[in-house]
Amino acid sequence: MLNWAPTLNFRYRFNKRSNLRINYRGTTTQPGMSDLLSIVDDSDPLNIKVGNPGLKPAFTNRLRLFYNTYIQSHQRSIMTYLNYSNTRNSISNKVTYDEITGGRTTQPENINGNWDVNAAVMFNTSVDSAGVWNINTFTTGGYNHYVSFLSLDKKSDSQKNVTRSMNIGERLSGSYRNSWLEFELDGSLNYTHSRNALQASSDMDTWQFSYGTNINLTLPWGTSVSTDLHENSRRGYSDESLNTNELIWNAQVSHSLL
């Protein structure tokens, strides 16, 4: 049994406030011992479990790229990253249906095609020279390609199924800050698109969005007040009870005795 786990870490500093990092890591996942044993478990004749001595270890590659910089003269910061991973020889349970006995036989098998990628960009800048007014934006996106064996019902063999999902998100905020007041307006939007090759009923196109404000007050004699008010909404779910609007208000008062 060999566990192969290569690692690479690279960092380059362009200057004191800008740097690039690249990280790679490979990991090996061994099959479970019970999956490798050439044993037939027929204690339940209608649900037979069979091992697979020919299973290969799964191997996952993970790559991360990260960059950030800060421009002091404009009080501006930029950050971005990209993550990618794929897995060879993933393990999924395959089911075979016996029409004569009505029983099902389950056996683990290797399957390929699993990978995902996600990325983000953050931009924060001061609008004025004093750094009192600020704007921040954070954009994210991702894609997932998931492959497995799937039985549509109890009387059918497993088939290779592919689920493709994509998500995009954005958060935008503007803020004002001085010695005693912090005030922010923000809004966010997230969209998820998912398609299932064998189960169209599992397809999704959903939206989640939120908007509101955050306020922090620093009062005399060690007293501070903070509050936030946000409207959170969801749309696109087949279950109407999940398509909701929620208004959430939080408030806090604190006092320091020191």
Where in this protein do the model-derived segments appear?
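Exposed, low-structure sequence patches enriched in small/polar residues
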Residues: M1-L258
